[in-house]
A protein has these predicted regions:
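Nucleotide and nucleotide-moiety/phosphate-recognizing core
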Residues: 1-116, 126, 130, 134-141, ...
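Active-site-adjacent mobile loop/cap segments within catalytic or ligand-binding domains
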Residues: 155-171
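Pocket-edge structural micro-motifs
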Residues: 71, 161, 176
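Short, glycine/charged-rich beta-strand-loop motifs at protein surfaces that mediate ligand recognition
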Residues: 116-117, 165
Length: 180
């Protein structure tokens, strides 16, 4: 079974959506992790509003396991601070920390699931690797589309534009990018 009951605290998994806090970033490409956590929480009918471990959190039961949903409020590049703190508190091993992040190498909405590996240039993942002390944690990478041109600044691509919106032309915004 994907979720495994083995934590004395009751929380068996951390499911972390990466993003940046605040209205300015709410529906941007970089916040697809937050959007995914919001979708899971909505489906489970629980708000992710409790501030713990420098993250908005709540617990849900998924697949028979108690899961802590997290949206770090440390900003993307410092997400590891929140993830590491919660993992240590609940004694959750890295292989039970599932991280959902954006991926600019994938088409919008396409998913890539990995057991572990490098940060691939993603600073949020890099910081989590640093704080967990390993790159061996599962992750779901959600495609947010490639930059329109190789010279296009990455921050200008993932931060100011809503999902489904191209800087040169308006198109329909995606409701969310999540696996069904």
């Amino acid at each position: 079974m994907f979720f495994n009951k083995n934590r004395a605290s009751g929380v068996e998994w951390l499911v972390v959506g990466l993003g940046n806090p605040g209205d300015k970033y709410e529906n941007t490409r970089h916040n697809v992790g937050f959007l995914t956590i919001d979708h899971i929480a909505e489906e489970q009918r629980v708000p992710v509003q409790k501030l713990k471990y420098r993250a908005l959190t709540n617990t849900v039961e998924l697949g028979g396991a108690k899961v802590l949903l997290m949206k770090p409020v440390t900003y993307m590049n410092l997400s590891g601070e929140a993830v590491g703190e919660a993992a240590r508190f609940y004694k959750i091993p890295a292989d039970h920390v599932l991280v959902i992040s954006d991926d600019v190498s994938l088409p919008i909405g396409k998913l890539r699931i990995r057991k572990g590996g490098s940060a691939g240039g993603h600073n949020g993942l890099k910081n989590i690797i640093q704080h967990l002390g390993t790159d061996q944690f599962p992750r779901v990478k959600v495609g947010v589309g490639e930059k329109p041109h190789p010279d296009y600044d990455m921050a200008d691509w993932v931060l100011p534009h809503e999902l489904g919106e191209h800087p040169d032309r308006k198109s329909t915004r995606l409701n969310s990018s999540h696996a069904k």
